UniProtKB/Swiss-Prot annotation:
GO terms for biological process: cytochrome complex assembly. It comes from Pyropia yezoensis (Susabi-nori). GO terms for cellular component: chloroplast membrane. Keywords: Chloroplast, Cytochrome c-type biogenesis, Membrane, Plastid, Transmembrane, Transmembrane helix. This is Putative cytochrome c-type biogenesis protein DbsD-like.
Amino acid sequence: MKLDLFVYNSQHFVNNITLYQLNHLNSTSFSFIFLSGLFTSLSPCIISILPVCILYIAGETQKLNPINKTKNLFLFCLGTISSFITLGILATLITKTYSQFFNGIPTISAVVIIYMGLNLLNIVHINSPKFNGLVTNNNYNFKMYLSGVGIGIAISSCSTPIFVTLLVWINSTQKIFTGLIFILIYSIGYIFPIIIGSIFSTSFLKLTESLSGIIMAPSVELCY
């Protein structure tokens, strides 16, 4: 079985178990939601973007001191989690056809990832005086948070099946507070590889390069 087909089938299997857990809430439901987020993150979609996230958090030179790296990681993850929660609230309030709501996100994802890559290469910058002043005055914190928001929007399209299941459950049960806690836990599990990768940035970047090569190989073969 090809890797991409295995990942697809596995995600749908986890999605079915998640739906069962949501309909039969117990003490293990919260931990399973975290594990479902973690499992969903182990896909080519997330692995391919990990190096960009790690470079933003740990710095291009990998020489940030532990305090600054921890601060960057916190702000980046805060931005990512807040984007997930915001998307969940908007999708629940605006529409019940969640697939239509997420249709435009892949395009937004591509734009965000391309911009962040070009920004890391110092090719593209935002030349707004107000934006630059805001970033400078807050010692880079706002830019790090905003980067997390952008990545959160970008990777949300990779988590559609289980994320939509959570949104449908929230809408059908009207347990909004519990649902938001589930989205919070799910998003933490979903970005857990980014957290681990940032802590062990040097070793993790080498690992993701190897994994990206293995994952991209079947796609290259299809071109011939």
